[in-house]
Amino acid sequence: MLTLFLAKRRSLGVVLAASAALGAAPPPIEPLPRGAPDLAGALVQTHRDLFAGIEGWLKSAKPSPDPPPDVTLNALFEQRIYRSLARDDLLARATLARLPQPLGDAARDIVAAHRELFRITPPISARTIRTGRAEQAGALLSYYREAERRFHVSWRVLAAVNFVESAFNKLRSRSAAGAQGPMQFMPATWRAYGLGGDIHDPHDSILGAANYLHAAGAPRNLRRALHAYNPSPAYVDAVLRYARRIGADRRAYYELYSWQVFVRTPQGDRRVTGPGR
């Protein structure tokens, strides 16, 4: 099946359609389509295959702790498409206009969130990058729901914060300012709101974040609370966009969970997790 991806004289859109029909997912370094029509077609097909794979993963008798290979590969290809659109406004407009609903709305939110985070994320040295495995998606979901019950902060918002701050703890590096852990707390803030827990523990960090957001005004004034968490309107908008996507379709949580970590370095973007590096 992988020979389909090596056919030099066939368009990428045809290759993707054929591979999808045979149940294959794009390899990790599959070149992206260049034009808006092919890019839109690839995004539609990849998104469809990704969500079908997520459904199969969740419905299996014994779901694997990590995303299955097809989910991982489709999620990576989709993520690469979104990152390319976020960096090219003209291409993004032409591509997004060709997408059917509800994918069109989801893609607009995701591209906008990428741009917002690009603007506020400084480059970091590759030597400081540390990564690790995320805790199981189901376990994290139980922590978000526990925090929601206790502090009345939507689990979707907590999941979005966890994703934006550390890609669900796949990114283990401290921030330039010294923030640490899955929810990126400054040590002094953690002492005040961490409930005596471990700043690096996903469960404790999620509850601490919910405690802080509640004290800062959530759920009544969620924007103010998120701005207190990270004083950037772009950050607030990005978190709310991702939370909206998770709320619109439960599979979007597992979609984001299956994405890889890309970081900005002085030499450019670098993917630091996932297959084919």
Q: What annotation goes with each model-predicted range?
A:
Residues D66-P69, A177, R220:
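Surface-exposed, polar/charged faces of alpha-helical domains
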Residues A159, A177-Q180:
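Short glycine-rich loop/turn motifs that provide flexible caps or phosphate-binding loops at active sites
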Residues K170-G178:
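Glycine- and aromatic-rich loop/turn segments at beta-sheet edges
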